[in-house]
């Protein structure tokens, strides 16, 4: 049984602001099955063949889309100008534009007393998107720019295209007063923010600079020799006195300041250096004796820093400096290390106990990171007539790095009280 409904163009009666309701072209059955309807009236061919009840409902797409800006257009204060679509059918008339501009002049003290002529009202230019200009908002906590924007007032832009307009009765807008009406943050507050954001972190900055130096060397190309020499350079400490360093006093002071590290920083830097040397030894470049020699130097510096971490003390008195003997490589490095106190909860350990803890940590680092390097490093032997004349030098050349490592391990075990190995 078919239901007689009006034609698709028929609309229901409406009064006032009630939207017009249009009958949909497809019947309910065809729309539910997503099938193209024959659109016959009063019943489509498909419903007649299948003996279905054919009904045509009202379209859900009818009516005008409600706009939030339409409700704000008649408000007393408007913070910014709404975006205007490109279609000429939706452009507001001159009276609406004049009302909107009047609300702006009443809310801004710099625009009070300004009038608009009819020719100006029809030539006003609006930005396509008001959110692109942050200076239009009145609730900003600081200015995005350091000086007023290099733009003309709204009325001057409109009058530039109309040269025949008489501006004698129109008051000029004070751009300075309009700009200063926005709130701004004092310069001292901005300086405080910059000082907080640029505050360096001591430990992380040193480790990060060391890693950047290694990454910079690798980015230049596959050069294991350059990477090994970079590790040696980063781990080296200038001996005092050094003729090259003392020739420029400022260079010596700067080097001394840059090489001050704490024990944790030494451990992190040594780990990165050991990983870099391990990569070089795994590469085919390690077959070159010059590259292997550079790896020996880098490993020797790593062992020296571990030994210096054991010798580091919290505070050095004047008597300690006077009674100290000739400075060794580890002794010079130990002076560059800051031994921070170690806490267990709220209890600070004694200085001797702190050295024992650091020695135990160093033993673990040596076993985990340095021992694999020694197993991978090739052994050098003296060849030729020199080897035949002096056989003792041959054995000394092969064991110099291992002897250095044994001394560090022995120092750590002495602090732990385990005695000799």
Swiss-Prot record:
One of its GO terms (biological process) is aflatoxin biosynthetic process. Its main location: nucleus. InterPro entries: AflR, OAF3, Zn2-C6_fun-type_DNA-bd_sf, Zn2Cys6_DnaBD. One of its GO terms (cellular component) is nucleus. It comes from the Eukaryota. Residues 1-20 are annotated as: Disordered. Disulfide bonds: none annotated. Residues 27-54 bind DNA. It is found in: Nucleus. Keywords: DNA-binding, Metal-binding, Nucleus, Transcription, Transcription regulation, Zinc. SMART domains: GAL4. One of its GO terms (molecular function) is DNA binding. PROSITE patterns: ZN2_CY6_FUNGAL_1, ZN2_CY6_FUNGAL_2. It holds the Pfam family Zn_clus. Residues 1-16 have a biased composition (Polar residues). Transcription regulator of the gene cluster that mediates the biosynthesis of elsinochrome C, a perelyenequinone phytotoxin structurally similar to cercosporin. This is Elsinochrome C biosynthesis regulatory protein elcR. It comes from Phaeosphaeria nodorum (strain SN15 / ATCC MYA-4574 / FGSC 10173) (Glume blotch fungus). The gene is elcR.
């Amino acid at each position: 049984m078919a239901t007689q409904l009006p034609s698709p163009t028929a609309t229901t009666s409406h009064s006032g602001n009630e939207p017009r309701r249009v009958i949909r072209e497809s019947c309910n059955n065809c729309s539910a099955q997503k099938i193209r309807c024959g659109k016959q009236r009063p019943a489509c061919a498909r419903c007649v063949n299948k003996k279905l009840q054919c009904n045509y409902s009202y379209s859900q797409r009818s009516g005008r889309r409600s706009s939030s800006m339409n409700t704000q257009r008649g408000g007393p204060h408007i913070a910014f100008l709404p975006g205007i679509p490109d279609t000429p059918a939706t452009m507001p008339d001159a009276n609406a534009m004049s009302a909107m501009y009047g609300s702006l002049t009443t809310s801004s003290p710099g625009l009070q007393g300004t009038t608009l002529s009819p020719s100006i009202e029809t030539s006003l230019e609006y930005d396509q998107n008001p959110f692109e200009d942050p200076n239009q908002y009145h609730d900003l906590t600081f200015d995005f720019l350091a000086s007023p924007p290099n733009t003309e007032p709204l009325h001057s832009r409109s009058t530039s295209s109309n040269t025949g307009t008489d501006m004698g009765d129109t008051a000029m807008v004070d751009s300075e007063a309009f700009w200063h009406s926005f709130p701004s943050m004092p310069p001292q507050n901005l300086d405080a923010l910059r000082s907080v954001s640029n505050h360096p972190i001591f430990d992380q900055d040193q480790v990060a600079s060391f890693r950047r130096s290694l990454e910079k060397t690798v980015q230049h190309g596959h050069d294991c020799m350059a990477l090994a020499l970079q590790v040696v350079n980063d781990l080296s400490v200038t001996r005092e006195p050094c003729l090259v360093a003392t020739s420029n006093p400022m260079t010596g002071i700067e080097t001394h300041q840059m090489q001050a590290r704490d024990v944790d920083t030494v451990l992190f830097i040594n780990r990165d250096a050991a990983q870099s040397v391990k990569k070089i030894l795994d590469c085919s470049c390690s077959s070159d004796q010059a590259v292997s020699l550079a790896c020996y130097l880098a490993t020797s510096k790593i062992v020296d820093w571990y030994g210096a971490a054991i010798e580091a003390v919290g505070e050095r008195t004047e008597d300690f400096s006077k009674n100290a003997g000739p400075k060794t490589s580890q002794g010079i490095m130990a002076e560059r290390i800051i031994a921070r106190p170690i806490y267990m909860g709220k209890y600070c350990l004694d200085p001797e106990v702190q050295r024992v803890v650091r020695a135990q940590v160093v033993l673990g680092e040596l076993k985990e990171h340095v021992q694999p390097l020694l197993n991978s490093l090739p052994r050098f032997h003296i060849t030729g007539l020199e080897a035949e004349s002096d056989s003792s030098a041959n054995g000394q050349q092969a064991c110099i790095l291992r002897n250095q490592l044994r001394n560090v391990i022995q120092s750590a075990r002495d602090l732990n009280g385990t005695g000799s190995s």
